[in-house]
Amino acid sequence: MPSEILVKILSYLDAVTLVCIGCVSRRFYHLADDNLIWVRKYAAAFRSKRSRWKATSVEETATSLSLLSVWDKEDGYWKKEYITKQISSVRAALTNSLSPVKRRTSLPSKTKESLRISGLGWTIILREASGKEHIMQHSNLSVNDNSVTVFWHDKNWPHVDTLSTLDLYGATPIFMEQYKGPNTSCPRWLSLIEKYDLSNLRKSAMIGCDRHVRVFCVNPGLLVGLWQENGGLAFVMANIHSHGLFERSIMGSDTIPYTLPPDTTFVDNYPDSMTFYGDKGFQLHIDIHGSKTYFLCSTFHNLFCRRAGINNGYVKFLMINLKNNREHLPLVGKVGLEWRTDCLNGRIESCIVVDMTLLDEDKKPIWYVSSPVCLRSACLPDFPQPAYSFEYMDSVGGVCADLGWFENTDEYFIVRLDIYLSVAKLQQWFGRQ
């Protein structure tokens, strides 16, 4: 069929169908890029809301003359302009939906609703050393109070020894109003969240296993499961904290991640006898879960850091004291990390996920993390019960905790909990030197 007739037919299609039909073949790709088609769709879709009067003959003549300049642009110019404008409108709509926050944690309160409305999903691109790419949309996810846990599992994974990197992206439908389901096949744009190096995965810290899989943690927040039988990929799990979740998932590009703008609070100098920073105290919210099942949700108020508590560039917050039984907190339920694939599922008893949000005196998140951690045997002096510990540390902050196992109640209790925050982060946050 002549190209002129095909272009005429394509002009009657909506924008979504046009984008999809451009993926059929090279010929349709070029035909679906026709500038005249897209400039008309652009004018119809993004016409100024103030221009509601009927066009006069003079305006119609001016419009027809402006269409003549369409041919001065390269093929696909107006298609790119249309999609860029559409992405901007979707970003604006999603940003407006995130304004309500929880009073307790200052994190978005309508995460589930925003996910449902936007159709936002997450995609990983596995790259082999040869350059070959494997693109996978998420299989399922769990929306937690302060984080999102995203799962990928498949029967046809590439061999783990051939992989060099894993890139995590937010994937948002370009035409949000037509496609609201996260698993719907539709045109999406990608926002890079994090890059992970998988070239030495087996040398990474193994944080748990059961009879089917071994799990390895790749910071920040990525868990990779390998089959015990053949060492192949079983599943991938990513833990993404809710603070800045949507911004990082929709505002970046496919090559550059979005960086949250710095939020500095300037305070007066305090003498050494008073608190190091702030006069109202920090607040910590901590959740411990197994990707779906919660074991602990707790908030600590009025936390202060003093100059005497600085060691190795970190300030220490003492949350729970081993010697004070009244401060000890139980983990409710059977502790462990749940995992699943297309054919099997299980639970790794030595692995849990910790979500932490440290707020300053104005309830702004100063440090936040969502990461799997490993429960390891520990020895606590003057503590008769079996003891375990877990820890997490990055350049900004960290956590160290000791747990006791009480056989009479079949429960873990957190008997010591310390939080660390870098002095450099505090100085940057409060504008101090």
UniProtKB/Swiss-Prot annotation:
Identification of the protein by name: F-box only protein 15
Superkingdom per UniProt: Eukaryota
Keyword Lipid biosynthesis in annotation: no
Function: Substrate-recognition component of the SCF (SKP1-CUL1-F-box protein)-type E3 ubiquitin ligase complex.
UniProt source species: Mus musculus
The protein's assembly and partners: Directly interacts with SKP1 and CUL1.
Tissue: Expressed in testis.
GO cellular component terms listed in the entry, alphabetical order: SCF ubiquitin ligase complex
Record keyword Thylakoid present: no
Keywords in alphabetical order: Ubl conjugation pathway
